[in-house]
Regions:
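Conserved phosphate/ATP/ADP-binding segment of small-molecule kinases
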Residues: 111-189
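Charged C-terminal helix
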Residues: 10-14, 238-275
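Active-site cofactor/substrate anionic-group-binding motifs, chiefly glycine-
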Residues: 44-96
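Glycine/small-residue-rich loop that forms an oxyanion/phosphate-binding "nest" at active or ligand-binding sites
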Residues: 74, 82-131
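Short, small-residue alpha-helix embedded
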Residues: 138, 203-235
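Short, well-structured alpha-helical segments that form the helix of a local strand-helix-strand
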Residues: 161-166, 224-240, 258-259
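Short pre-catalytic strand/loop immediately N-terminal to key active-site residues, enriched for Gly-Thr
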Residues: 159, 163, 190-204
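Glycine-rich phosphate/adenosyl-contacting loop at the front of the ribokinase-like
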Residues: 1-54
Length: 275
């Protein structure tokens, strides 16, 4: 793909064939995330047809890290597991050539020791880094600060630094916002429009997206297919949010409807019908 900016939504012809692989292959996805987001993350993965295992029970990081089809590491998982657990899982994944996703939650919020751990993880070669504008800017070495886990930076500020990070580290950088920006290691840039503001009112929605990115990575045999695949799962997420918002009376009903919408979209697409 040339270094140009493209747009991709759920109706793009390249989207659904990628997503179908998750339902058909049902990949085993291992995740280290925080207890706040674990349930939603697991439900999102189950809804699209993946098989998740989440947590750092004895032996899991070293075992599942190398056995999974893909893995995601949510830095806020340090609430309930250790840096050693995360590094062990990442090293096991790298040794087995298992692709993994890093979500640098709250990077740049002013907690130096925490940020140092994230930088150590990032140096171990994730296939994808996914975060909000402030997190990506901070990881790229910028001066952006976050308000806890919330972004205080704009997408416009983050994209140039995210692109530099993607190119210098030869990985994909996904920046979530009112529209999502997927940045490739050779200067590629895919914009994913859509979604709904209620996603920002559901705890763990961004964290669960990291798991979904891992799920699609697990289905790919070629690294060159990753950029479009990452954009495709963001497009699925956006469309499911739009569907869920139609009948939602608030954040709680939206969260339930969102998981249902993911399942309907995936099942309908696999069966060749409309959701």
């Amino acid at each position: 793909m040339d270094a140009v900016t493209l747009s991709m939504d759920y109706d793009h012809p390249g989207c659904r064939p990628v997503l179908r692989r998750i339902r058909v292959q049902s990949p085993f996805i291992y995740g280290l995330t925080n207890y706040v987001a674990a349930t939603l993350s697991a439900n999102v993965l189950l809804a699209v047809g993946a098989a998740p295992a989440i947590g750092a029970a004895p032996g899991w990081p070293s075992g599942f890290g190398g056995q999974a089809g893909a893995m995601w590491v949510n830095a806020a998982g340090l609430i309930n597991c250790t840096a050693h657990d995360m590094l062990t899982a990442v090293d096991a994944a790298n040794a087995a050539h298992v692709p993994w996703v890093l979500d640098p939650v709250a990077m740049g919020a002013g907690v130096g020791e925490y940020d140092t751990i994230i930088r150590t993880l990032a140096a171990r070669g994730p296939a994808v880094v996914r975060g909000n504008a402030s997190e990506i800017m901070a990881l790229a070495g910028g001066a952006a600060t976050a308000r806890g886990v919330e972004t205080t930076a704009s997408i416009a500020q983050a994209v140039p630094m995210g692109q530099e990070l993607a190119c210098s580290k030869k990985m994909i950088v996904a920046i979530s916002g009112p529209e999502d920006h997927i940045l490739g290691p050779d200067g590629q840039h895919i914009i994913v429009p859509g979604g709904h503001r209620l996603l920002t009112c559901v705890t763990g929605a961004g964290c669960a997206l990291g798991g979904l990115v891992a799920a699609v990575l697990a289905t790919l045999s070629m690294e060159s297919d990753r950029l479009v695949a990452v954009a495709a799962v963001h497009a699925l997420y956006a469309r499911a949010a739009e569907i869920a918002a139609r009948d939602a009376s608030g954040p709680a009903s939206f969260a339930t409807g969102f998981v249902d919408a993911l399942s309907r979209l995936q099942n309908a697409d696999t069966l060749g019908t409309d959701a």
